[in-house]
Amino acid sequence: MANHKSAEKRNRQNQVARLRNKSTRTAMKNSVRKLDEALEAGVEADTAEALRGAISRIAKTASKGVIHKKTASRKISRLTKRVNALVAA
C-alpha cells in the first residue's frame, strides 16, 4: 500500500502500462503461434504471409519497449531460419 501521493500515482501508471504491455505481448505471441501452425501445415504461401506478420508484430513490440531490441532481432532471425529451412526442403 502506497503512503505517498506520488507512489499512488506511480502504481496507477504501472497498472495501465502493464495492461498495455500484456496486450502487445499477447498479440506478438499469437502471430508467432500462427506462423508455427503454418509451418506445421507446410504450405509455403501461408508460411511466407505468416512470417511477414510475425516479423512486423515482433518489431512493433520491440519499438514500444515491451521487449528488448536484440531479443526481437533474435526471435526474427530464428523464425526466418525455420521458414527458409521449409522452403529449401
From Swiss-Prot:
Composition bias type Basic and acidic residues, residue spans: 1-11
Key words, A-Z: Ribonucleoprotein, Ribosomal protein, RNA-binding, rRNA-binding
GO molecular function: small ribosomal subunit rRNA binding; structural constituent of ribosome
Transport keyword on record: no
GO biological processes: translation
Segments for region (Disordered): 1-30
A GO CC term attached to the entry: small ribosomal subunit
PANTHER family: 30S RIBOSOMAL PROTEIN S20, SMALL RIBOSOMAL SUBUNIT PROTEIN BS20C
Stated role: Binds directly to 16S ribosomal RNA.
Protein family according to the UniProt entry: Belongs to the bacterial ribosomal protein bS20 family.
Protein name: Small ribosomal subunit protein bS20
Gene encoding the protein: rpsT
